[in-house]
């Protein structure tokens, strides 16, 4: 009896294997971190071969620790850091360059050139995305331009491009495939047809021969060829934020989740018709189950939230561990008038200002490190409020029935009760954390399990979801308005630093 489903969660800082039972509960997990490589300011890379070795190790470790074999696992799902870009040799499977990570900004000038006179929105009506260093297409173009002979080899069919899902699947099964959610983050896929857009690929100088096949998020892509799970089907792939949305059972239009990690990523399910934002949000594929129509989402991507706590710890030394920030912030009643805008690599949604850089505003002699700790946490909530406002503006202007009444949350920072209460206060809606915190891996497990009949349908996913903690707003309208006005003033101080 195949009693469990395994998920591989290939993230920005680590790779994990998590095993789930039919109730969506975590049976056990294994995790390995990998190095963050910073060759130059603004550049971020990963060693993809190390990530693959770590994948093999966590698979084996999880099976060994739980005393399971391939006969116990119904299917494997993959979820991954999105946009991180890799090119490898088809014949040897060897990368020709380190993976270029989603946070990397080396393509800033290239993005401007690609936009031309039309600017960042040149391809948005087809891809749902503004031209940005964030997405995979410009990163791929950079590799083709800068690695000797890469373009010629790609045109000859000797090279494969993929995001990290494709890299893991290639090594597990030999198949060169991506799913529609990851493809939707490349800037090379037409959102409506869910196929590679030949004209955009030509504009980017990307040979179609190197692109993976686009498939649904829930189907059998192939069987694992070696290791402790040899013969088990890989049957689900979702980009990490889409996986968290699926794992949070945001399966109906108007349901939204916000993941608090290195950055914040809020997705709002908009149903089977793509909604193109006029207010700085991304339009993306939320998921597609086998041959069913794709479900779309509006997304607000925030670059720096949890990593701001790391900055406070590692760069300023104001705390020695991340979990010290909550008691420090609680030791004062408010932020003392200080606001921190962490535009370390520009501002993502909804402002999209690559010229912005971080500021601390409102400093006086009264401000202590406790006030700064509180300002760090509050900046996450303020940035989330901006995304929610953009979603509301899109819904109103396009007459969509997508009112956000509750926000489901997940990710490491949701353990911070002070932040979650402030988030509820500044949004003026309840904030709900689920019982199962591993929503990203759970979403990938659900996609894989549905494909092989382990779960019978999405009703099973809804039934598995349960609330753990709910925070309700207590802030007055006047206090909320005062905070938001001060925050906006601080954000506007970040503009034009690199112009």
Curated annotation (Swiss-Prot):
ATP binds at residues 12-14, 262, 306, 310, 412. It comes from Nocardia farcinica (strain IFM 10152). ADP binds at residues 12, 16, 262, 306, 412, 416. Sn-glycerol 3-phosphate binds at residues 12, 82-83, 134, 240. CDD domains: ASKHA_NBD_FGGY_GK. Key enzyme in the regulation of glycerol uptake and metabolism. Catalyzes the phosphorylation of glycerol to yield sn-glycerol 3-phosphate. Its EC number is 2.7.1.30. This is Glycerol kinase. It catalyses: glycerol + ATP = sn-glycerol 3-phosphate + ADP + H(+). Pathway: Polyol metabolism; glycerol degradation via glycerol kinase pathway; sn-glycerol 3-phosphate from glycerol: step 1/1. One of its GO terms (biological process) is glycerol metabolic process. Signal peptide: none annotated.
């Amino acid at each position: 009896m195949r009693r469990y489903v395994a998920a591989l969660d290939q993230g920005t800082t680590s790779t994990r294997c998590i095993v789930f039972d039919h109730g969506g509960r975590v049976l056990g997990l294994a995790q390995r971190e990998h190095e963050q490589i910073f060759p130059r300011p603004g550049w971020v890379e990963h060693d993809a071969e190390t990530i693959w070795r770590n994948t093999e190790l966590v698979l084996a470790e999880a099976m060994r620790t739980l005393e399971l074999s391939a006969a116990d696992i119904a299917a494997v799902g993959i979820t991954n850091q999105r946009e991180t870009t890799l090119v490898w040799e088809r014949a040897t499977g060897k990368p020709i360059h380190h993976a270029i990570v989603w946070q990397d900004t080396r393509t800033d000038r290239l993005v401007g050139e690609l936009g031309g006179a039309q600017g960042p929105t040149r391809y948005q009506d087809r891809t749902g995305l503004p031209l940005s260093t964030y997405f995979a297409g410009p990163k791929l173009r950079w590799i083709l331009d800068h690695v000797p002979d890469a373009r010629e080899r790609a045109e000859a069919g000797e090279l494969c491009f993929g995001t990290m899902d494709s890299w893991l699947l290639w090594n597990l099964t030999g198949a060169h495939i991506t799913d529609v959610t990851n493809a939707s983050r490349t800037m090379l896929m037409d959102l409506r047809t869910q196929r590679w857009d030949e004209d955009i690929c030509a504009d980017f100088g990307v040979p179609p021969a190197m692109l993976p096949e686009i498939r649904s998020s829930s189907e059998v892509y192939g069987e694992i060829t070696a290791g402790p799970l040899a013969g088990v089907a890989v049957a689900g792939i979702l980009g990490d934020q889409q996986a968290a949305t699926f794992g949070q059972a945001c399966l109906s239009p108007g349901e939204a989740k916000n993941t608090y990690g290195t950055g914040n990523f809020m997705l709002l399910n908009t149903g089977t018709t793509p909604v193109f934002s006029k207010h700085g949000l991304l339009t993306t594929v939320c998921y597609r189950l086998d041959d069913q129509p794709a479900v779309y989402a509006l997304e607000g991507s925030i670059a720096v939230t949890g990593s701001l706590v790391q900055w406070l710890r590692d760069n300023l030394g104001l705390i020695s561990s991340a979990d010290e920030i909550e008691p420090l912030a609680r030791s004062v009643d408010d932020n003392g008038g200080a606001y921190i805008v962490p535009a370390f690599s520009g501002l993502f949604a909804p402002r999209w200002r690559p010229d912005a850089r971080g500021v601390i505003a409102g400093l006086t002699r009264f401000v202590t490190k406790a006030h700064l700790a509180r300002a760090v946490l509050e900046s996450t909530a303020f940035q989330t409020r901006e995304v929610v406002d953009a979603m509301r503006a899109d819904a109103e202007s396009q007459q969509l029935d997508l009112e956000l009444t509750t926000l489901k949350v997940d990710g490491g920072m949701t353990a911070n009760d002070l932040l979650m209460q402030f988030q509820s206060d500044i949004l003026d809606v309840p904030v709900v954390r689920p019982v199962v915190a591993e929503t990203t891996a759970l979403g990938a497990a659900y996609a894989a399990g549905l494909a092989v009949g382990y779960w019978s349908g999405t009703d099973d996913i809804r039934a598995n979801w349960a609330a753990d903690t709910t925070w309700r707003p207590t802030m007055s309208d006047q206090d909320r308005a005062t905070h938001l006005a001060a925050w906006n003033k601080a954000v506007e101080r970040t503009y034009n630093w690199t112009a």
